[in-house]
Amino acid sequence: MLSRALVIALCLTIPSAGPDQKTSAKKSLEGVWKIVEIVTTGVDAATITSPQPSLAIFTKGHYSVLSVNGAEQRAQFAPPKDPNNLTDAEKIARYEQWSRFTANAGTYEVKGATLTRRPLVAKNETVMARNSSLASEFKLDGNTLWVTTKSEAGQPASETRTKLKRIE
């Protein structure tokens, strides 16, 4: 009789463990994070231990990521001589500053160790127009989050491991 009760208890408990773990991982992902290190292997290999400002926010099912890419501050530029008619040099200066900035937001889903983001709005039109998701592996350890992204099929092989620290 005891073994039958134990089997029934296990059957009732084990199926509910999966969703609770998923919910737990998703809840611990919720918060505000900043990038503290970026390591890229393969094409354009680099390690950035003092990244520029960033902010990643995860709520119940939505995310927003803003970051200045690279190890160097973005160059400042002088105000335009004629704001309605920028010179080629003024346009290039603005492009150089703007191209190093990442901004996108949308929905996300967690399945096991996979974080899948679906951008709804982005600075780069291509990111939101591609109608596909951005899948990364992730690992949480207390207030540290690692997100590992591999290059897409057809692109030169590389892997970027981004380390984030919880700030809220």
Where are the model-predicted features located?
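Sec-dependent signal peptide recognition
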Residues: 1-8
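Lipid interaction determinants
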Residues: 11, 15-168
